[in-house]
């Protein structure tokens, strides 16, 4: 936000704050997002655990705020369906998720090449995505608890690969997949595999 000249951080919220107050730079802080939403805001940035991010996103949209939310959109299809309904009920509001990989320079170069048709049409693609050492799936934290996270490495990191596949090839309609938690043994997947095909045959 600090890199965008016409944007200014007005207030922040974190459940770990012991009280409400104001930082020395004038930014106000809250423990409860509902108090934050009482502020005069234009944009809401949601960086929360997956169990509460959908509710906060919806609350922001209903307040008439543009919303940027970290991925994933939700823990399951019910979460996502609620957000879609809310967004459709507020057509003037912009909602964006943190699929930052599609803006990497190499990905943009690939998109230009695909659109140019220089190499012909895409026939198939293969993607492999490993976890970051910064993501602690091997420790018992919220990312290993299905009730909070909704899923494991596929939902948290593999979603980037799925997003890029959709960016390059379009929507997939025929999907065969399986997941396992055989490595760490927690309540979420630590390995995921999928074979996907678009209506026009890209695999």
What are these regions (language model features)?
Residues 7-9, 41, 122, 172:
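Core-facing hydrophobic residues within beta-strands of well-ordered domains
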Residues 64, 91-92, 117, 201:
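Glycine-centered short loops/turns at secondary-structure junctions
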Residues 27-86:
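Beta-loop-alpha module in the N-terminal Rossmann-like domain of NAD(P)-dependent dehydrogenases
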Residues 93, 101-186:
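Predominantly a Rossmann-like dinucleotide-binding segment in NAD(P)-dependent oxidoreductases
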Residues 11, 43, 94, 124:
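Short, Asp-centered acidic motifs that coordinate Mg2+ and/or phosphate
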Residues 194-201:
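Active-site beta-strand termini and strand-to-loop segments that position acidic
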Residues 4, 24, 39, 90, ...:
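Acidic-histidine catalytic/liganding microenvironments
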Residues 1-24:
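N-terminal Rossmann-like dinucleotide-binding module
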